[in-house]
Amino acid sequence: QRQMCIRDSGLGDNVELQANTIATVLAQRLGASYRQLYVPDSVSEEILNSILAEDIGVKSVVDIIKQADILVHGVGQASVMARHRRLPPEFIKKLLDDGAVGEAFGQYCALDGRQIYMTNNAGLMLQDLPKIGTVIGVAGGRSKAAAILSVIRASRQDILITDEAAAHDIVRMLEND
């Protein structure tokens, strides 16, 4: 039987559009079982390590996620994701001044793929992606072109699902390199 694990940091206020809600509905419609990982990104490294060490339910979901055959993940704009995570404005300014344009898995990347900053994160990180069978990045809109390219350069992506506007801008950026 198919099994889906859902890792969502619960960003934003619209529950219907959060990844955990979408993935739950998808799993139900596909007849798959699913497990959710509820660990906020905003916890300290000490608390996160304690949760991962002591909570067998969380650890088992993290272990399943790290053994995934197929991973579908989103790519966000660094500025938008930093605000969603309620990072302090002065820190967001520094993050952007340091060149962050894209975000995936709580890791902020520059256009050249350098990792600028990483939040405390239960689950996968960009460096875990080479161990996954097929990695599918999903993002769209002209405003996300730089973010998409930064994450592609920072980590392995086997498939990109995007729209025409973002694709054209990515091609333009690559031609100007």
Predicted regions and their residues:
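Short, small-residue-biased leader/transition segments that mark boundaries at the very start
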Residues: 1-6
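Conserved phosphate- and dinucleotide-binding cores of soluble alpha/beta proteins
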Residues: 10-177
